[in-house]
Amino acid sequence: MTHVEVVATIAPQLYIEETLIQKINHRIDAIDVLELRIDQIENVTVNQVAEMITKLKVMQDSFKLLVTYRTKLQGGYGQFTNDLYLNLISDLANINGIDMIDIEWQADIDIEKHQRIITHLQQYNKEVVISHHNFESTPPLDELQFIFFKMQKFNPEYVKLAVMPHNKNDVLNLLQAMSTFSDTMDCKVVGISMSKLGLISRTAQGVFGGALTYGCIGEPQAPGQIDVTDLKAQVTLY
């Protein structure tokens, strides 16, 4: 069984309000990583992100900071073209205080360009979470394993795969793919079966070799997320 860090996802509208700071502080003991979603901010800039990071830095000794721009293609609000998206991800390397950066994987990506950006982020001491999300369904087991395999070829620190289950077998396939991958590959793995049906993938993440589990602060930011305080308590049981 692996050690699991609890990620708390926040999605502020440009400014970090004092009420949000209070909510984070109230749950500080349950948070290992704070995920700052930025795709909900229209035409977000690096300078705007840097300002938010400065506000969060006050508490940063308590947790690592992950920045994520989730594109509409993978279930987020982000409307950037692929080039604008990749330029933003690359430029995040210059912001002090960011520990981890999410970069999406698709089957049709420019492999060489993706690798250059990932290497660039790592040269600035940013841990890379390469991720793929399917909000419609759960692919067959062999396809799940193939996606994990393709993502790990970029040598990231983490590979994350989140899929939508329609039955218990979908959940089992995701857990099996994650477990097999964690036993055979060097990078850390994250596997999420979304919605209430897949909640066990969040609470028992470590049993199947997972390294991160995502919760929320108040309103869920993805199907199946529960408050990080409850999530931490559940993860600790394992």
Curated annotation (Swiss-Prot):
It is an enzyme of class 4 (lyase). It holds the Pfam family DHquinase_I. The active site is at H133, K160. It catalyses: 3-dehydroquinate = 3-dehydroshikimate + H2O. GO terms for biological process: 3,4-dihydroxybenzoate biosynthetic process; amino acid biosynthetic process; aromatic amino acid family biosynthetic process; chorismate biosynthetic process. Pathway: Metabolic intermediate biosynthesis; chorismate biosynthesis; chorismate from D-erythrose 4-phosphate and phosphoenolpyruvate: step 3/7. Its EC number is 4.2.1.10. One of its GO terms (molecular function) is 3-dehydroquinate dehydratase activity. The keyword Lyase applies. HAMAP family: AroD. Belongs to the type-I 3-dehydroquinase family. Homodimer. This is 3-dehydroquinate dehydratase. It comes from Staphylococcus aureus (strain bovine RF122 / ET3-1).
